[in-house]
Amino acid sequence: MSVVNNRVALTNLVSMEALTTEEVLGLINRGSEYKAGKVVISDHQKDLVANLFFENSTRTHKSFEVAEKKLGLTVLDFNADASAVNKGESLYDTVLTMSALGTDICVIRHPEDDYYKELVESPTITASIVNGGDGSGQHPSQCLLDLLTIYEEFGRFEGLKIAIAGDLTHSRVAKSNMQILKRLGAELYFYGPEEWYSEAFNAYGTYIAIDQIIKELDVLMLLRVQHERHDGHQSFSKEGYHQAFGLTQERYQQLKDSAIIMHPAPVNRDVEIADSLVEAPKARIVSQMANGVFVRMAIIEAILNGRNKNS
């Protein structure tokens, strides 16, 4: 991976640690340029992209689709429920098929952690892989749109106090963000139920009670409680969680005037955040959704740059 003519060029995008700091900042900057309407878009109709989503998704799936169509790519329709997956076809063979049909890029979301490893290591699959979320692993495009949202607000990452809060163990968003935010110089804090916390997070920040740090925060990044990834044996009270760990009206009032609230969505209202705060003045949840299109345009462009460079 490299930066060519001041433009990022990628073969695949599967994790944040695979990106250099220069590439991360380049993608954020390019997303900002797309948002500002500063980019003359080339004709990409000959380039084929398939969005292979094996988990439910609204924001990631549709914003990739919007990004691809804005760039002029030909988007191949794929419905997992109506595909040979229901006949037992593996993910590998599905992607192998798409690649053989001439698909240039496969954007994939899959419930298996690290699903992409055998795909990017395959000598036969020529399609580039963009990870749209792997199990409880990583979510690089969400991370990049989060970075753009933060940078738009503060113009920097160095020294910002950022708390990532909630269902940490199951969150691919947390795992992608904590790595790059620490690398960019942010001061990270984590909070949530102890049973949803892993010591692996200690290398990136400090586990702390929300009420000890909330007045100092620049960014409060809330995470969805992922009921579908729990084993079903844990007792859970929405009201209990909201009062102990959620953003209540009382906690909102303690945030600095300059602080912002983020959430990757979908939001469990009155669980992670009070219903009335989802569109509050400090909330940037809608901005995150909008920024997703522009960052994903930058990602797709970077993949096409990489393919053209290697062709």
Swiss-Prot record:
<feature type="binding site">
    <location>
        <position position="139"/>
    </location>
    <ligand>
        <name>carbamoyl phosphate</name>
    </ligand>
</feature>
<feature type="binding site">
    <location>
        <position position="87"/>
    </location>
    <ligand>
        <name>L-aspartate</name>
    </ligand>
</feature>
<dbReference type="InterPro" id="IPR002082">
    <property type="entry name" value="Asp_carbamoyltransf"/>
</dbReference>
<feature type="binding site">
    <location>
        <position position="224"/>
    </location>
    <ligand>
        <name>L-aspartate</name>
    </ligand>
</feature>
<comment type="function">
    <text>Catalyzes the condensation of carbamoyl phosphate and aspartate to form carbamoyl aspartate and inorganic phosphate, the committed step in the de novo pyrimidine nucleotide biosynthesis pathway.</text>
</comment>
<feature type="binding site">
    <location>
        <position position="60"/>
    </location>
    <ligand>
        <name>carbamoyl phosphate</name>
    </ligand>
</feature>
<dbReference type="InterPro" id="IPR006130">
    <property type="entry name" value="Asp/Orn_carbamoylTrfase"/>
</dbReference>
<dbReference type="GO" id="GO:0006207">
    <property type="term" value="P:'de novo' pyrimidine nucleobase biosynthetic process"/>
</dbReference>
<feature type="binding site">
    <location>
        <position position="59"/>
    </location>
    <ligand>
        <name>carbamoyl phosphate</name>
    </ligand>
</feature>
<comment type="pathway">
    <text>Pyrimidine metabolism; UMP biosynthesis via de novo pathway; (S)-dihydroorotate from bicarbonate: step 2/3.</text>
</comment>
<comment type="subunit">
    <text>Heterododecamer (2C3:3R2) of six catalytic PyrB chains organized as two trimers (C3), and six regulatory PyrI chains organized as three dimers (R2).</text>
</comment>
<feature type="binding site">
    <location>
        <position position="266"/>
    </location>
    <ligand>
        <name>carbamoyl phosphate</name>
    </ligand>
</feature>
<dbReference type="GO" id="GO:0004070">
    <property type="term" value="F:aspartate carbamoyltransferase activity"/>
</dbReference>
<protein>
    <recommendedName>
        <fullName>Aspartate carbamoyltransferase catalytic subunit</fullName>
        <ecNumber>2.1.3.2</ecNumber>
    </recommendedName>
</protein>
<keyword id="KW-0665">Pyrimidine biosynthesis</keyword>
<comment type="similarity">
    <text>Belongs to the aspartate/ornithine carbamoyltransferase superfamily. ATCase family.</text>
</comment>
<feature type="binding site">
    <location>
        <position position="109"/>
    </location>
    <ligand>
        <name>carbamoyl phosphate</name>
    </ligand>
</feature>
<feature type="binding site">
    <location>
        <position position="142"/>
    </location>
    <ligand>
        <name>carbamoyl phosphate</name>
    </ligand>
</feature>
<dbReference type="InterPro" id="IPR006132">
    <property type="entry name" value="Asp/Orn_carbamoyltranf_P-bd"/>
</dbReference>
<dbReference type="GO" id="GO:0005829">
    <property type="term" value="C:cytosol"/>
</dbReference>
<dbReference type="InterPro" id="IPR006131">
    <property type="entry name" value="Asp_carbamoyltransf_Asp/Orn-bd"/>
</dbReference>
<dbReference type="Pfam" id="PF00185">
    <property type="entry name" value="OTCace"/>
</dbReference>
<dbReference type="GO" id="GO:0016597">
    <property type="term" value="F:amino acid binding"/>
</dbReference>
<dbReference type="InterPro" id="IPR036901">
    <property type="entry name" value="Asp/Orn_carbamoylTrfase_sf"/>
</dbReference>
<feature type="binding site">
    <location>
        <position position="172"/>
    </location>
    <ligand>
        <name>L-aspartate</name>
    </ligand>
</feature>
<keyword id="KW-0808">Transferase</keyword>
<dbReference type="Pfam" id="PF02729">
    <property type="entry name" value="OTCace_N"/>
</dbReference>
<dbReference type="GO" id="GO:0044205">
    <property type="term" value="P:'de novo' UMP biosynthetic process"/>
</dbReference>
<dbReference type="GO" id="GO:0006520">
    <property type="term" value="P:amino acid metabolic process"/>
</dbReference>
<feature type="binding site">
    <location>
        <position position="265"/>
    </location>
    <ligand>
        <name>carbamoyl phosphate</name>
    </ligand>
</feature>
